[in-house]
């Protein structure tokens, strides 16, 4: 009974972190284009389309047709990320494109949750380019393109056995599925996109899992993993910055 109570308490703590970290960590207002407030929604989300090629909203988003590797330098040490465009082409393409544009250079990890147990490190808010912007106030920003519009990418989840990902719809606990059979899972070291309660609200903010986080599978888009430097990730603290980010392999796969 004591063991079961501990398990229940652990799960409750993780769910609380999910509500206060990832969902509020991406956008509080989603800029002026949306007034949606963040929070865990129990209502099922409706997919815009399971075939992204038919959706004009995402026609011009970059795609990664294959694999790539990205090197982050944090606290003077490298973190090598594998970026999976095979199973998450749009999410991966967005990240690689932003790396090549220099968006992540100098940005802070504004949320780091290690207690009461390891959870995630989260960064990628472009507002952090301003050295006077308080780190504690980060978490609402996304990438603004040359036209002044915020780039949003669809929720992209590929299930085992499917030839294409499903878009714009959570397939995990947010849709009532406890253990979805997804290709890219929230294992320790997984690289994924933060978003608000709206499924297609991810932009530039990402997180790295500090532990296996199965309860996030199917609801947040994993698009890569840490290949080398997980010890560096484990030692990231709030306010630490990405000194540089560059594509070291597979840049030719960005379309």
Stretches with model-predicted labels:
Residues 12-22:
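Bacterial N-terminal signal peptides
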Residues 2-13:
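Bacterial N-terminal signal peptides that target proteins for export
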Residues 2, 21, 25-255:
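Cyclophilin-like peptidyl-prolyl cis-trans isomerases
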């Amino acid at each position: 009974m004591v063991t079961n109570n501990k398990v229940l308490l652990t799960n409750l703590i993780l769910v609380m972190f999910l509500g206060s970290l990832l969902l509020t960590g991406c956008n509080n207002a989603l800029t002026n284009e949306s007034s949606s407030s963040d929070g865990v929604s129990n209502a099922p989300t409706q997919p815009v389309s399971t075939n992204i090629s038919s959706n004009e909203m995402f026609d011009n988003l970059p795609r990664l047709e294959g694999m790539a590797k990205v090197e982050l330098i944090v606290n003077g040490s490298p973190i090598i990320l594998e970026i999976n465009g095979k199973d998450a082409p749009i999410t991966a393409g967005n990240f690689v494109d932003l790396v090549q544009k220099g968006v992540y250079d100098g940005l802070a990890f504004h949320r780091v949750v290690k207690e009461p147990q390891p959870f995630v490190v989260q960064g990628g808010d472009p507002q952090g380019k301003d050295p006077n912007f308080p780190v504690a106030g980060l978490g609402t920003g996304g990438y603004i393109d040359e036209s002044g519009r915020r780039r949003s990418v669809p929720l992209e989840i590929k299930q085992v056995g499917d030839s294409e990902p499903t878009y714009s719809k959570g397939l995990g606990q947010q849709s009532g599925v406890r253990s979805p059979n997804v290709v890219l899972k929230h294992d320790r070291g997984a690289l994924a996109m933060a978003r608000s309660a709206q499924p297609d609200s991810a932009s530039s903010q990402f997180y790295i899992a500090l532990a296996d986080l199965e309860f996030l599978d199917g609801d947040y888009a994993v698009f890569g993993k840490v290949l080398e430097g997980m010890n560096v990730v484990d030692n990231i603290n709030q306010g630490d910055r990405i000194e540089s980010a560059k594509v070291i392999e597979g840049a030719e796969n960005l379309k």
